[in-house]
Amino acid sequence: CDLACSLIYAPVCGSDGKTYPSECSMEATACIDEVVITKVHDGPCETKCSAACTKEYNPQCGTDGVTYANPCTLEYAKCKSDGEITFDHAGPCKPKCPTVCTLEYNPQCGTDGRTYGNPCQLKVAECESDGRITLDHPGECDACSLKKVVGPCRGAFRRYYFDSVSGKCEEFVYGGCGGNDNNFKTLDACQKRCMEE
């Protein structure tokens, strides 16, 4: 198949129901795929996508990040996009969370007891936690008044926290993720932050 097709867009409808950018492009596809495709007419093919869907609400997330009201409306979008849009998962799509933040230091204390470097970093945490983490107050969190939090992961890392009842830094086993700012890698770091007046 040695067909050099021009880049001029002159769509044609092929007998396979697909629209090709040009008759040459259709012939090249037929040659490469070793099938017979003939031109039905000039211009794009008419899609036979049925938009007759019920108003049932059963949200479906498409691969385009759009939440469709039900499987039928997603199927319609799939048909209109020539299969570009497909089913991703049941339920609404999650909003895309920002991922790029500046390095400015403008500390923000989150409701999870963690200090975030700036408002953008807190917004990312808020988005990724589906709104469970929000702003507690501007500025750094008071790590020393927070309760010890092991976190949901199953690692085993030796860490230290300040126990406000005993007034001392105590050892604990940290799971490796989650947790809060009352989590120090060394006893010395804990004592310097929480015990020195």
Curated annotation (Swiss-Prot):
Q: In terms of domain of life, where is this protein from?
A: Eukaryota
Organism whose genome encodes this protein: Melithaea caledonica
Which protein, by its recorded name, is this?
A: Four-domain proteases inhibitor
Q: Which cysteines are joined by disulfide bonds?
A: 1-31, 5-24, 13-45, 49-79, 53-72, 61-93, 97-127, 101-120, 109-141, 144-194, 153-177, 169-190
Q: Where is the BPTI/Kunitz inhibitor domain?
A: 144-194
- Limits of the Kazal-like domain: 1-47, 48-95, 96-143
Molecular function per GO: serine-type endopeptidase inhibitor activity
UniProt entry keywords in alphabetical sequence? Disulfide bond, Protease inhibitor, Repeat, Serine protease inhibitor
Q: Which CDD domains match?
A: KAZAL_FS (cd00104), Kunitz-type (cd00109)
Site (Reactive bond 3) found at: 103-104
Pfam families from the xrefs? Kazal_1, Kazal_2, Kunitz_BPTI
Q: Which residue numbers mark the site Reactive bond 1?
A: 7-8
Residue(s) at site: Reactive bond 4: 154-155
Q: Which InterPro entries match?
A: Kazal_dom (IPR002350), Kazal_dom_sf (IPR036058), Kunitz_BPTI (IPR002223), Kunitz_BPTI_sf (IPR036880), Prot_Inhib_GrowthFact_Antg (IPR050653), Prtase_inh_Kunz-CS (IPR020901)
Q: What role is this protein assigned?
A: Inhibits trypsin, kallikrein, subtilisin Carlsberg, human leukocyte elastase, porcine pancreatic elastase and chymotrypsin. Two domains are for the inhibition of chymotrypsin.
Residues of the site described as Reactive bond 2: 55-56
Per the UniProt entry, what are the Gene Ontology biological process annotations, in alphabetical order?
Answer: cell differentiation
Name one cellular component (GO) term: extracellular region
